[in-house]
Amino acid sequence: MGSKGLKGVMVCLLILGLVLEQVQVEGKSCCRTTLGRNCYNLCRSRGAQKLCSTVCRCKLTSGLSCPKGFPKLALESNSDEPDTIEYCNLGCRSSVCDYMVNAAADDEEMKLYVENCGDACVNFCNGDAGLTSLDA
């Protein structure tokens, strides 16, 4: 992967961080800041709750509200999670995948980016995200 592809992957990861900030999923973790929430969500794609909460300075809670000083709670159980996932996919594809398509050098590379980026958005929004390369 050339520097153009690496730059695209870096931008993709940054935009996914923004998506994480906007799309909340049901959970029982509370974080002090949005950065902590993003850290926790990204960590949870591979790590355990307790480890991620410690590393990202978040707290695990069994209730629907967060302790004082930890305002960043994921959506409560009455949320419309399917709508959230649908909007996550739409936002991910329109921002991240559009950027990747515009960065493609030719039609073949563009098709590869569209296919892999769409799959990555589905996995990301459904909570199955892993850090993988787009040139698989």
Swiss-Prot record:
Pfam families noted in UniProt: Thionin
Signal peptide start and end residues: 1-27
UniProt keyword Transit peptide present: no
Propeptide: 73-136
One MF annotation (Gene Ontology) recorded for this entry: toxin activity
Origin: domain of life: Eukaryota
Disulphide bridges: C30-C66, C31-C58, C39-C56, C43-C52
GO cellular component: extracellular region
Record Gene3D superfamilies: Thionin-like
Compartment(s): Secreted
Keywords: Disulfide bond, Plant defense, Secreted, Signal, Toxin
GO biological process: defense response
Protein function: Thionins are small plant proteins which are toxic to animal cells. They seem to exert their toxic effect at the level of the cell membrane. Their precise function is not known.
Family: Belongs to the plant thionin (TC 1.C.44) family. 4 C-C subfamily.
Record-given protein name: Alpha-2-purothionin
Organism this protein belongs to: Triticum aestivum
Designated gene of the protein: THI1.2
